[in-house]
């Protein structure tokens, strides 16, 4: 960088993104920051902060007021189960340029609990459209986005909140379900009962064979033999 020359913001972000990619190439797993934040694979969302360790009783307005001292908050999204119970993490969207890394490096506590902060990572999905002869181009169906947890053990995935866009955010921390709540992980399989039917042999089989003189007549799937004299 030449001294006295100010680079555009887009170029600086590009250099920062390349630096992250270099770190990822050196590590077989996801990049882990100094505060324990595991940076998963994906695209970093600007001016968006991941907030983990949220108390179940905290609402979005309290989070908005708390982070307003770091910049103008545009929106706060707390991820919840279908029943409305908080999963313990969420996202803070700032309406202005904010240095997310400066916020992440600070030991921030909220209501006596230390928050787990990190940049929001957005994973791009291929928006393949499903076409059909019965469906026009304007009625194509896009795949449903889902939340992905990079710390869950293999074979175990928590229920995922659905966003209204074509992208998905990934959380770097794993959170257990609240007491008394059980979420089925494997869909139930229903076995189909098989019935065996025995059909009686026709009288003309075996030793009692009848020589057919004329053609056979088929009526409603039942073969009837008519012998014309």
Swiss-Prot record:
Source taxon at top rank: Eukaryota
Gene Ontology molecular functions: mRNA 3'-UTR binding; mRNA binding; RNA binding; sequence-specific DNA binding; translation activator activity
GO cellular component: cytoplasm
Upper taxonomic lineage: Eukaryota, Metazoa, Chordata, Craniata, Vertebrata
GO biological process, one term: negative regulation of miRNA-mediated gene silencing
Cell location: Cytoplasm
Effect of residue 91 to A: Abolishes the RNA-binding activity
Domain RRM: 47-128
Tissue: Testis and ovary specific. In ovary, it is localized in the cortex of oocytes. At the onset of embryogenesis, maternal product is located at the vegetal pole, before migrating toward blastomeres through cytoplasmic streams as early embryogenesis proceededs.
Protein name: Deleted in azoospermia-like
The keyword Cytoplasm is assigned to this record: yes
Family: Belongs to the RRM DAZ family.
Protein encoded by which gene: dazl
Keyword Zinc: no
Main function: RNA-binding protein involved in gametogenesis in both males and females. Acts by binding to the 3'-UTR of mRNA, specifically recognizing GUU triplets, and promoting the translation of key transcripts. Establishes oocyte polarity through interaction with Bucky ball (BUC). Interacts with Bucky ball (BUC) mRNA to mediate Balbiani body formation and oocyte polarity during early oogenesis.
Residues of the DAZ domain: 172-198
Species this chain originates from: Danio rerio
Keywords for the protein's UniProt record, in alphabetical order: Activator, Cytoplasm, Developmental protein, Differentiation, Oogenesis, RNA-binding, Spermatogenesis, Translation regulation
Entry note about domains: The DAZ domain is essential for the translation activation activity.
């Amino acid at each position: 960088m030449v001294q006295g020359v100010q680079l555009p913001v887009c170029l600086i972000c590009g250099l920062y993104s390349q630096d992250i990619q270099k770190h990822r190439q050196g590590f077989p797993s996801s990049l882990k920051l100094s505060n324990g934040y595991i940076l998963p694979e994906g695209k970093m969302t600007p001016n968006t902060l991941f907030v983990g360790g949220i108390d179940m009783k905290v609402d979005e307005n309290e989070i908005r007021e708390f982070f307003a001292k770091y910049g103008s908050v545009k929106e706060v999204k707390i991820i919840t189960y279908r029943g409305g119970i908080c999963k313990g993490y969420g996202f803070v969207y700032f309406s202005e340029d904010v240095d997310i890394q400066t916020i992440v490096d600070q030991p921030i506590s909220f209501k006596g609990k230390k928050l787990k902060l990190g940049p929001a990572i957005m994973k791009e999905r291929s928006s393949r459209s499903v076409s059909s002869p019965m469906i026009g181009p304007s009625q194509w169906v896009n795949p449903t986005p889902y939340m992905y947890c990079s710390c869950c053990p293999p074979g175990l995935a928590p229920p995922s909140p659905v966003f209204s866009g074509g992208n998905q955010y990934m959380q770097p921390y794993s959170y257990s379900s609240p007491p008394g709540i059980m979420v089925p992980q494997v869909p139930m399989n229903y076995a189909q009962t098989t019935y065996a039917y025995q059909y009686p042999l026709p009288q003309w089989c075996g030793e009692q064979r009848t020589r057919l003189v004329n053609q056979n007549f088929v009526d409603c799937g039942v073969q009837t033999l008519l012998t014309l004299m």
